[in-house]
Amino acid sequence: MGRRPARRYRYCKNKPYPKSRFCRGVPDAKIRIFDLGRKKAKVDEFPLCGHMVSDEYEQLSSEALEAARICANKYMVKSCGKDGFHIRVRLHPFHVIRINKMLSCAGADRLQTGMRGAFGKPQGTVARVHIGQVIMSIRTKLQNKEHVIEALRRAKFKFPGRQKIHISKKWGFTKFNADEFEDMVAEKRLIPDGCGVKYIPNRGPLDKWRALHS
């Protein structure tokens, strides 16, 4: 018996069932890489950010996440170059799905017990996604806006249900508004730190604040 189609595992019916010492023998997830492109680009290089947002409460298989990642990456490399973007998959497949294998050969009724002891063995992993949760994000330069929308639109076809494409008002992968970001950096309220930023609050020892602004 082959793999069941993923539509059998689309809906979130049971509680989360992660890999643990009670749930052993779980096959590895198909998706192993969650960040692609120019991961080490500084925060000020890629101000534009686009999100793919789920519109349903459902389960997405690790195979679907991997297929969407490859699809978006291939299009962005072709249109923006391999150093012109940074893709981040925001879901991780931690929920284990099970299968109660049934024999379909002759004399199967003598070998198996039907629905007695039907808990099932681990078959694969899925990610549970809520309404409004971000599935995938891409940050890039402002002139690549149309390419980001097209890459996410193509990746949408790898998932069941409905997803929305949203161009963020934030700067890159940070939580600060794009129209205020550069002013906050100039005032030293934000310090660039890799692909993120450190926020410097107005509270704390005065000598630290003076040393920063001297």
From Swiss-Prot:
GO BP term (any one):
regulation of translation
Q: What is its main location?
A: cytoplasm
Q: Per its UniProt entry, which superkingdom is the organism in?
A: Eukaryota
Gene Ontology molecular function: structural constituent of ribosome; translation regulator activity
What Gene3D superfamilies does the annotation carry? 3.30.60.300, Ribosomal protein L10e/L16
Cross-link Glycyl lysine isopeptide (Lys-Gly) (interchain with G-Cter in SUMO2) - where?
Answer: 175
Q: How is it modified after translation?
A: Citrullinated by PADI4. Ufmylated by UFL1.
Cross-link type Glycyl lysine isopeptide (Lys-Gly) (interchain with G-Cter in ubiquitin), residue numbers: 188
Q: Which InterPro entries match?
A: Ribosomal_uL16 (IPR047873), Ribosomal_uL16_CS_euk_arc (IPR018255), Ribosomal_uL16_dom (IPR016180), Ribosomal_uL16_euk_arch (IPR001197), Ribosomal_uL16_sf (IPR036920)
One Pfam entry for this protein is Ribosomal_L16
Q: Which GO terms describe its cellular component?
A: cytosolic large ribosomal subunit
Compartments it resides in: Cytoplasm
Q: Does the keyword Ribonucleoprotein apply?
A: yes
Q: Which UniProt keywords apply?
A: Citrullination, Cytoplasm, Developmental protein, Isopeptide bond, Ribonucleoprotein, Ribosomal protein, Ubl conjugation
Post-translational modification Citrulline, affected residues: 32
Q: PROSITE patterns per the record?
A: RIBOSOMAL_L10E
Give the family from UniProt: Belongs to the universal ribosomal protein uL16 family.
PANTHER family linked to this entry: 60S RIBOSOMAL PROTEIN L10
Q: How is the subunit organization of this protein annotated in UniProt? A: Component of the large ribosomal subunit. Mature ribosomes consist of a small (40S) and a large (60S) subunit. The 40S subunit contains about 33 different proteins and 1 molecule of RNA (18S). The 60S subunit contains about 49 different proteins and 3 molecules of RNA (28S, 5.8S and 5S).
What's this chain's function? Component of the large ribosomal subunit. Plays a role in the formation of actively translating ribosomes. May play a role in the embryonic brain development.
Indicate what this protein is called per its UniProt record: Large ribosomal subunit protein uL16
Organism of derivation = Macaca fascicularis
